[in-house]
Regions:
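Catalytic domains of riboflavin
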Residues: 1-308
Length: 308
């Protein structure tokens, strides 16, 4: 049986205007729900053609949908069908659209391809579209597959990694019985049609390996009764949460360094609650690090203490 390709191979084909197959494996968990091994045909929206849309509709058995970042859809004033509207496993669904200058009703492969390209065109404005139409947009969660491991987020992530607009087109692949195709079928399907195939799991690993996922917001010395620490304030680009690194002494020597991962506890750390020992643990860590001469405390906020 043919195997999976690398994310790098998939990116190269996407940049050359080809379709790829994107698979979430059976053990993938999305929004707390068990995945079913679903596979999707995917390509960059800006390179979509009538032939590619026709292929998706004939071979995937499903009408193609457009996936895009939240910011991109908001700029085009494309909103949810109803506030909070969600499709299967949490996919966020928008109101269907047609490009205003489609030749016919918008249902043909040519018209759908035009609408999809318009949705990815940086020059497009809300006035370029009419609603309802025949192309349904799906809104990706900020943070992509590192926030939600779905096809919507994966396709937008791949588009961005491919240096394209954050807009893609996907279509779920069905087998001959009309059911969602399983992984062996998807591997054979990709091999038969010469498509690269990769998993969302591998995309998650690729992003974690190649991207810097935190940003330094501020740095400041902080005198304490245990000595002077340097405080580094970071913000996660995935969940937008703040993280604090309290550094004491020189930790760049390559020698083993004391490190504490501390779950932030307002009541224990700052208010002196006797219902937990969080504050005591933090002070003890600062004291031990000062005695050792160097070390780091990573302070993770929004992890409230046990006892309140």
């Amino acid at each position: 049986m043919p195997g999976f390709n690398t994310i790098e191979d998939v990116i190269e084909d996407l940049q050359n205007g080809r379709m790829v197959v994107l698979v979430d494996e059976r053990d993938t968990d999305i929004d707390g729900q068990e995945a079913v091994g679903e596979g999707e045909l995917m390509m960059l929206a800006e390179l979509t053609t009538a032939d590619s849309i026709n292929f998706m509709m004939r071979h995937a058995g499903n009408p193609p949908m457009v996936t895009a970042s939240k910011e991109h859809l908001e700029a085009l004033e494309l909103h949810h069908t109803v506030p909070g509207a969600q499709g299967p496993r949490g996919a966020s669904i928008g109101v269907s659209v047609n490009a205003r200058d489609t030749e016919n009703t918008g249902v043909s492969a040519q018209d759908r391809a035009l609408t999809i390209r318009k949705l990815s065109d940086p020059a497009s404005t809300p006035e370029n579209f009419i609603q309802p139409g025949h192309v349904t947009p799906l809104r990706a969660q900020p943070g992509g597959v590192l926030r939600r491991a779905g096809h919507t987020e994966a396709s937008v992530d791949l588009a961005q990694i491919a240096d394209s607009r954050p807009v893609a087109v996907i279509a779920a692949i069905l087998d001959e019985t009309g059911k969602l195709a399983d992984t062996p079928y998807l591997l054979d399907f990709a091999h038969e049609h010469g498509f690269k195939i990769a998993t969302i799991h591998d995309l998650i690993a690729h992003r974690r390996r190649t991207e810097k996922l935190i940003h330094l917001e501020a740095k400041s010395p902080m005198p304490t009764r245990f000595g002077e620490f340097t405080v580094y304030a970071y913000r996660s680009l995935v969940d937008d949460n703040p993280y604090i690194a309290m550094v004491y002494g020189d930790v760049s020597s390559g020698e083993p360094t004391l490190v504490r991962m501390h779950s932030g506890c307002l009541t224990g750390d700052a208010l002196g609650s006797l219902l937990c020992d969080c504050g005591e643990q933090l002070e003890r860590s600062m004291r031990l690090i000062a005695v050792a001469g160097s070390g780091v405390i990573v302070y993770i906020q929004h992890h409230e203490g046990r006892g309140i």
